[in-house]
Amino acid sequence: MKFLITGGAGFVGGNLAVMLSESGHSVLCIDNLSRRGSENNLKRFKDYSNIHFLHCDIRNKEDMSRIKFSPDVVLECSAQTTAVDGYNNPMYDFTNNTAGVINVLEFCRERNCGIIFWSSNKAYSGDFCNSIPMHETETRFVWSDSKYSARGWSHLGFNEDGDLNGGNHTIYGVTKNAADILIQEWSSAFNIPSIINRLSCIYGPHQFGKVSQGWIVWFALAKKFGSQLKYYGFEGKQVRDCLHIEDLGNLILKQSQNIHSHFGSYYNVGGGIENTTSVCELSNNLDLRMNISHLETINEGPRRADQKIYISDISKVSSEFNWTPKISLDDGLESVLSWINDDSVDFSWIKQ
């Protein structure tokens, strides 16, 4: 198959490009190279003759028209991915995460190809997620009432029946939500094969995490290089399900090969109930694995629209694609630490 990957020099896009190439597929990556770490992925691509790169910005329709490659599927990985930055510059989130997607959809319509889109767990509002009864333990929030029921939620996590309405999605979440609905509409109106994945926490090697995004890898990097760590609210008891990038790649291969039989479908995708951690649990886990003393952690106020618990119910995607995550959080962290300890990777920016 032939793949066009937008945001192809980023963490998800770059890893998918390599995985697809190693599976024998042809890949064109496009990226505006605005994200730190992009240059490292470009270096990786040089080892693969079937990965090509074009400097391109999806916000620019003329850039998209320069693409001569005709893919079978577009993997739409481009985004401004930081949930908190949009409050400072909402238009930047909108142009990257919503308006640019329209250009990608029009490209798909003109080239008669499918699209797989990276949406977000922020499609579901913080108000809804935090309305589920919960209590605190020493290290995490836990759902409380075994008899409680709500549309879009069970003790396996949040499922696709959840309402996209409500407040506190974050600006980032709203722009991804809008793109999510746009893709559903374009797919229906113009017969574009589409699959939407509402992703939870994705992590793994080659993720240049930072304070505001990519927190699992950021914590590992900060601990290795002695940078200050902060818990933003709730003493780090917020819980997420975590999915390793290799498991995501295996799912994308299955979805790409079956996109026509899952036309217009959307899925919650993450590590699921078996792969969860709180922020402070992750910090303690890394201390043990890295054999370091616990660094002092500053507690600051919570971020707006933060979900105290978000765990994906992956029943639907698991059933329809015969897919489940294979890499445990423990094994996934070991892969991250192995990459961080690779002397050939440039981490000089974190020391500045």
Predicted segment positions?
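Short, charged helix-to-loop "capping" segments that act as catalytic/coupling loops
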Residues: 35-40, 62-71, 115, 166-168, ...
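NAD(P)-dependent short-chain dehydrogenase/reductase
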Residues: 129-157, 171, 177, 181-256, ...
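C-terminal substrate-binding subdomain of Rossmann-fold SDR/epimerase-dehydratase oxidoreductases
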Residues: 16-22, 221-352
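N-terminal Rossmann-like NAD(P)+-binding domain of SDR-like oxidoreductases, especially those catalyzing
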Residues: 1-200, 335
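Short, solvent-exposed loop/helix junctions and linker helices
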Residues: 6, 95-98, 172-173, 209, ...
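Conserved sequence/active-site signature of Rossmann-fold short-chain dehydrogenase/reductase
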Residues: 59, 123-124, 202-204, 248, ...
